[in-house]
Amino acid sequence: MLGFSDQYNYDEEFKPESVAHMFVTKAVVSRNPRDDVKGKWVIVAIYGQFRILGFAREGDKVWTDIPCPSRCYDDVVFYEGKFYAVDCHGIVIVCEIDDPKSTVIAPAPVGTRDTIQKYLVESSGDLLLISRERGGRLFEGGIDDEILPRYYTKGFSVLKLEKNNNAGEEEDEAKYEYPFCWIEVKSLGDRALFLGRNPSVSLSASEFEGLFKPNCIYFTDDNEENFYFEPRGGGGLDMGIFNTETSTIEPHFTGEYRSPISPPFWYL
């Protein structure tokens, strides 16, 4: 089993269930290790108390950290032969594995906040940035209403990564500094997105007729930092289907979630 570097600096002891979310938040592989393809596969993981990035190649004995301009990464994806990651502020980087380093390629979208969960997903050849806004007592300051859930999802916004043709111009350094920029996406068309603790996935609804709805975002409760502390209003209940056309949310699971330490995930 591969070992990570020590990322846990605590002076007191914690119960296992209270720190379970601090080990590996998410892991993405460059290809299926079982595929008969030349070249070794690579896996990149978000791990540790500060959610930093590390990678391992096929045959490695230890993980290697990827130097990054920030920490607290929300998601990572393998897209067009490279690994991309987004931090809690919405800044996107591309990771180099052969000579471990990272480069910022796109700024944080206007209006984003570190309290908004970010996801990266490839959909129809495009790289999308999905922002998930939460409400509830935990995220809306000044609210002290025991009836209101601790947290719940209010909605999503979708942006597409596009090449910035004005990059390098001196008229507005802040605007043209990065090689890529964000374009708003108002419709997913035939696609449905599946977001959560697992790697994000985009599927065609017409290819799986009757199984799920097009132009929708299916999401699970992946708020690990607060998942364990209050079963009512959290802990597996913040799940649903967001319609990008109507901006409405409907439930997809109404049963009782039974695991106190393991957030739900998609099995696709």
State each model region's role:
Residues 1-141, 156:
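A sequence/structural signal of beta-propeller blade repeats
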Residues 142-146:
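Short, surface-exposed loop/helix-turn segments at secondary-structure junctions
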